[in-house]
């Protein structure tokens, strides 16, 4: 059976603000199944934001597991991410899940993969999914050459990715946190 897939998730950290945004398109093979999916969410008392790329059902399973890890570790992002990655790598059922998570709190931004990787990216810029390279290129150019806010960079870069990538649309969901975690 074909997987639901294709998306773009972008996270930018600038100043005291971190933002994660994503498009709303869900694709099955060559067909757009839904155009307004929410692939970015607030977790753990609204102190963590997370987005996913990959299989939709798989990602929802991982969101639930990640939120449980956040609860278990009192919202400590890095510890929860490492514990989820351990489970993901070693659990026979979880290993089959095909998704990548981008997560952030007021202090750290991370990529969590099914290979058990927890990666803190350079320059706190995360771009995942089929439109990730387009969004990353646009965001880097905007970060280096403008004074735009993190939210404005995410909006503009995702719009550019949506104009280029056939698996990405311009129906955006954007969540932001400042240094107080709000």
Swiss-Prot record:
Q: Which GO terms describe its molecular function?
A: metal ion binding; threonine-type endopeptidase activity
Superkingdom of the source species: Bacteria
Q: Which InterPro entries match?
A: ATP-dep_Prtase_HsIV_su, Ntn_hydrolases_N, Proteasome_sua/b, Proteasome_suB-type
Going by the UniProt record, its keywords in alphabetical order are: Allosteric enzyme, Cytoplasm, Hydrolase, Metal-binding, Protease, Sodium, Stress response, Threonine protease
Q: Which Pfam family, an example, fits this chain? A: Proteasome
Query: Which parts of the sequence bind Na(+)?
Result: 162, 165, 168
Regarding activators and inhibitors, the annotation says:
Allosterically activated by HslU binding.
As its record notes, the protein acts as a catalyst of: ATP-dependent cleavage of peptide bonds with broad specificity
Q: Where is the active site?
A: 7
List where in the cell it is found: Cytoplasm
User: What CDD domains does its record include?
Assistant: protease_HslV
The protein's Enzyme Commission number: 3.4.25.2
Gene Ontology process terms (BP):
proteolysis involved in protein catabolic process
Here the disulfide bonds are none
Q: Which GO terms describe its cellular component?
A: HslUV protease complex; proteasome core complex
The UniProt entry's sequence similarity note says:
Belongs to the peptidase T1B family. HslV subfamily.
- What does the function comment of this entry state? Protease subunit of a proteasome-like degradation complex believed to be a general protein degrading machinery.
User: Which named protein is this?
Assistant: ATP-dependent protease subunit HslV
Q: Specify the species.
A: Legionella pneumophila subsp. pneumophila (strain Philadelphia 1 / ATCC 33152 / DSM 7513)
């Amino acid at each position: 059976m074909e997987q639901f897939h294709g998306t773009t998730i972008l996270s930018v950290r600038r100043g005291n603000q971190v933002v994660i945004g994503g498009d709303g398109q869900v694709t099955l093979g060559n067909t757009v199944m839904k155009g307004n999916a929410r692939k970015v969410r607030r977790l753990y008392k609204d102190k963590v934001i997370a987005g996913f790329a990959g299989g939709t059902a798989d990602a929802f399973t991982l969101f639930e597991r990640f939120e449980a890890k956040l609860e278990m570790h009192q919202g400590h992002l890095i510890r929860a991410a490492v514990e989820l990655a351990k489970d993901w790598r070693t659990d026979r059922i979880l290993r089959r899940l095909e998704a990548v998570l981008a997560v952030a709190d007021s202090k750290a931004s991370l990529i969590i993969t099914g290979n058990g990787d927890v990666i803190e990216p350079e320059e706190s810029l995360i771009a995942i999914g089929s439109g990730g390279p387009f969004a990353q290129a646009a965001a880097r150019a905007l970060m280096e050459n403008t004074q735009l806010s993190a939210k404005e960079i995410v909006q503009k870069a995702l719009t550019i990715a949506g104009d280029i990538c056939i698996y990405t649309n311009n129906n955006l969901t954007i969540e932001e946190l400042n240094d107080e975690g709000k």
